[in-house]
Amino acid sequence: MAKRDYYEVLGVSRTASADELKKAYRTKAKELHPDRNADNPQAEAQFKEVNEAYDVLRDADKKAAYDRYGHAAFEGGMGGGARAGGGYGQQGDFASAFSDVFEDLFGDFMGGRGGAPRSRAQRGSDLRYNLRVTLDEAYRGVQKTINVPASVACDACKGTGAEGGAEAVTCPTCSGMGKVRAQQGFFTVERTCPTCNGMGQIVKNPCKVCHGAGRVEKERSLSVNIPAGVETGTRIRLAGEGEAGMRGGPSGDLYIFIEVREHALFQRDGVHLFCRVPVSITAAALGGEVEVPTIDGGSSRVKIPAGSQTGKQMRLRGKGMPALRGGGAGDMLIELAVETPVNLTARQKELLREFEKLSEDNNPEGKSFFSKVKGFWDGMTG
């Protein structure tokens, strides 16, 4: 079943502001929340659809990608945009992205459900890095060194957030639950613990370097292997090279998105290459050979049939791009562009006029065209 338009899901126009999007989301989420629609089996699916729509439209980069490509922008790859000013971005988890909206909507009403103490360790966020390579590098494969700014585990406290690497202790306010309960009229509501900010544990003596966070900002230098055959949109995952986890949690992953630059000679279509080659009017008329460059740095001689016209294509098999996952290489298509002479001398012009008189029967396309024109005019006057 095809996905619905995200703007339609939220009931807003494509020009809706961030505040209008948030207001529409709050209304829809409150209306469709499963806890309030126990008798409606469709509510949960609709609620997830609303969350998905808001997740995309609330983020400027994701929204721009969706406005341009629709749902196809997120098929086969992860969403998320780059941070402003660089080729690097961060993806937080779903719960943190929507916690402000849900808390305002429902007041975290979870009373009576019980629960277990929260783990203080949290996985780090995934990162995105946009990397540009040349077509030649994409053909051969290349090793690239990139500098990635990211949060890394604090060396001073070994990522614990505590001075000297000491262990955190259970929060005395929430007893490690990360939530506190309060009675409001007939309802028991749960809210994030103000003492530990929902972590369930506190650090008595915070590390002086990271101030209790367990991680610090640092630029890392990483070596990345770019395989032969990559194209724009290829995604490379480096496990564990994302943001460091919070207080001893595992690191996220780094996703590298490839962009292949345009080439001065070749245009690319998947594994195939296209090259437009100029030939003289003499070579096109009489036939001959032309030397064309190939992406591997060499060249190939190609025979031009007599009477070739602009646009005629010839194929060099196996001279295209290598397939990313093996299976050989594509082809190179050569398109002829017959050049019209310019800056002619008086003698050259004289010879061309003489040639024209002698070649009235040697231009089949021209004769066919003007025959059609005559038939068209005769039909108009008849």
UniProtKB/Swiss-Prot annotation:
Residues 5-70 form the J domain. A zinc finger (CR-type) spans 141-219. It is found in: Cytoplasm. InterPro entries: DnaJ, DnaJ_C, DnaJ_domain, DnaJ_domain_CS, HSP40/DnaJ_pept-bd, HSP_DnaJ_Cys-rich_dom, HSP_DnaJ_Cys-rich_dom_sf, J_dom_sf. Homodimer. Participates actively in the response to hyperosmotic and heat shock by preventing the aggregation of stress-denatured proteins and by disaggregating proteins, also in an autonomous, DnaK-independent fashion. Unfolded proteins bind initially to DnaJ; upon interaction with the DnaJ-bound protein, DnaK hydrolyzes its bound ATP, resulting in the formation of a stable complex. GrpE releases ADP from DnaK; ATP binding to DnaK triggers the release of the substrate protein, thus completing the reaction cycle. The J domain is necessary and sufficient to stimulate DnaK ATPase activity. Zinc center 1 plays an important role in the autonomous, DnaK-independent chaperone activity of DnaJ. Zinc center 2 is essential for interaction with DnaK and for DnaJ activity. This is Chaperone protein DnaJ. The gene is dnaJ.
